[in-house]
Amino acid sequence: MQHRAATDFWQQYHALSPEVRARADKQFSLLKANSQHPSLQFKKVGERHGQEIWSARVTLNHRALAIRRDDGYLWFWIGDHKAYESLIS
């Protein structure tokens, strides 16, 4: 599966602290190697407009969201857990 990131994702990514960005890079590498790794908690969290929404853990307090597509995942959001909760509810 391919993983791509939307422009908004990159803007949010660059607004994160250097420590969180480094962890996001590590988790993304892990995701590409083994999407079932327990530290990722990679899972479907909902559906909007007929598209599956998937989540991956970045840190204890940060998550990333993607839309599942035929050819892989489009990552559209990364941020803190509080904002994540409001996005998926």
Regions found by a protein language model. Name each.
Residues 27-29, 33, 38, 63, ...:
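A periodicity- and composition-biased signal for non-globular, repetitive helical segments
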Residues 2-7, 11, 15, 51, ...:
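Enriched for short, Lys/Arg-rich terminal
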Residues 30-56:
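A short, surface-exposed loop/turn module that caps and links secondary-structure elements
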